[in-house]
Amino acid sequence: MQKIRRDDEIIVIAGKDKGKRGKVLKVLADDRLVVGGINLVKRHTKPNPMSGVQGGIVEKEAPLHASNVAIFNGATNKADRVGFKVEDGKKIRVFKSTQKAVDA
């Protein structure tokens, strides 16, 4: 079970976007995350009239490592760590500071 999943709200704790919050769009296999509006890079694209792609400079999200982000706890309004607990025979994710379920 992953500590950070798609659609979780996270806060960046290290790097050029430190302090920014965003929603996880994609979780990649090598402990990297794509987060909406964070770690934006510019890519130069060639126009392709066959597929209708207009050329130019495109800004898009680049993946960042999971160690540079923390899950955001809305109850405490701070970054938090994730732990696991077994409740009713199911393994659930909980915030370490409040012991409340992440998906609640």
Curated annotation (Swiss-Prot):
Transmembrane segments: none annotated. SMART domains: KOW. GO terms for cellular component: ribonucleoprotein complex; ribosome. GO terms for biological process: translation. GO terms for molecular function: rRNA binding; structural constituent of ribosome. PROSITE patterns: RIBOSOMAL_L24. The keyword rRNA-binding applies. SUPFAM superfamilies: Translation proteins SH3-like domain (SSF50104). Keywords: Ribonucleoprotein, Ribosomal protein, RNA-binding, rRNA-binding. The keyword Transit peptide does not apply. InterPro entries: KOW, Rib_uL2_dom2, Ribosomal_uL24, Ribosomal_uL24_CS, Ribosomal_uL24_KOW, Translation_prot_SH3-like_sf. Part of the 50S ribosomal subunit. Belongs to the universal ribosomal protein uL24 family. One of two assembly initiator proteins, it binds directly to the 5'-end of the 23S rRNA, where it nucleates assembly of the 50S subunit. This is Large ribosomal subunit protein uL24.
